[in-house]
Regions:
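Conserved PLP-enzyme active-site core in the AAT-like
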Residues: 2-311
Length: 312
């Protein structure tokens, strides 16, 4: 029988635990009733994140799904509006269809390339002709995702994001960036977060993934976009102050893992795709082990992974 002394959980960067510094910050956090207008720790976090994002204001919410939903609904405040987004974007696949069921917003998908981008000309072709608004939804928003989870953590460059921003302005649209892992993209590209999201009218950033806070996501944008809607904020501040600098080491470890997996017969990793902290590996058809057998073997040895597809 295998004795597991330590479990290695590789399923997702969401399975993080607060550090001792975070726990201490939570214990001594100055709090108040945010509903009545002011929670000092929440206000400090929002001010700091607005500065980092290069935006006028920010708002703390419990989850990334909620943050993206709020952002889309603000930009598409009229029911029947349409948002253009990638067919493999997190908003489209993993967020319960909330923009449609709650907000009455219609998603119009454009094919995601392997690097997480969408072809600029395809985005433009997807924009509805306003002269036919009696028949079609009205396009009001374009959404990007950086880094792109389904593409293995690939990063959108400043040049690409700026081009999409220019396209949005040309057609009178807004641009939202799902930046759940925007700090990973910043570290990988060597570009400040504020520059990566400069073209965006709104951006979300998760604090509980690679940064390790217990929960929470920030929405940032203009003051008119953000209206005032912490214990958790205290931990999130520690995540910002202490853990952003550790992301580069996470990326290095991911590359080491990918290189090691690639040496195992029957497994394959496209190393060119490992830019940040996400590693996808394929189980080749001629492999001597099946997906289920591999997962059970790893779990028995204290290593947890998450399936993405039949052989991935």
């Amino acid at each position: 029988m295998v004795m597991i002394e330590r479990r290695v959980d590789l399923r997702s960067d969401t399975v993080t635990k607060p550090t001792e510094a975070m726990r201490a910050a939570m214990a001594r956090a100055e709090v108040d009733d945010d509903v009545l207008g002011y929670d000092p720790t929440a206000a400090r976090l929002e001010k700091e994140m607005a500065k980092i994002m290069g935006k006028e204001a920010a708002l703390f919410v419990p989850s990334g799904t909620m943050a993206n939903l709020i952002s889309v609904l603000i930009h598409c405040e009229i029911r029947g509006s349409e948002v253009i987004l990638g067919d493999y974007s997190h908003i489209h696949i993993y967020e319960n269809g909330g923009i449609s069921t709650i907000g009455g917003v219609h998603p119009r998908t454009v094919k995601n390339n392997e690097d997480g981008t969408m072809d600029i000309h395809l985005i433009e072709e997807a924009i509805r002709n306003p002269n036919f608004a009696i028949c079609y939804p009205t396009t009001r928003l374009i959404c990007l995702e950086n880094s792109h989870a389904h593409s293995g953590g690939r990063c959108l460059t400043v040049e690409y994001t700026d081009k999409v921003g220019e396209l949005a302005k040309k057609h009178g649209l807004k641009l939202h960036i799902d930046g759940a892992r925007i700090f990973n993209a910043s570290v990988a590209l060597g570009v400040p977060v504020s520059r990566l999201v400069q073209a965006a009218d709104s951006v979300t950033a998760c604090l509980s993934k690679g940064l390790g806070a217990p929960a929470g996501t920030i929405i940032a944008g203009s003051k008119s976009f953000i209206s005032k809607v912490g214990v958790i904020c205290a931990a999130a501040l520690v995540a910002l102050e202490e853990n952003v600098g550790k992301l580069e080491n996470d990326h290095k470890k991911a590359k080491i893992l990918a290189e090691g997996l690639n040496k195992i017969k029957g497994l394959k990793v496209d190393l060119a795709y490992v830019e940040t902290n996400i590693v996808y590996f394929e189980i080749l058809e001629d492999s001597s082990i099946t997906e289920i057998e591999l997962f059970k073997y790893l779990e028995a040895h204290g290593i947890l992974v998450m399936p993405e597809g039949p052989l991935k």
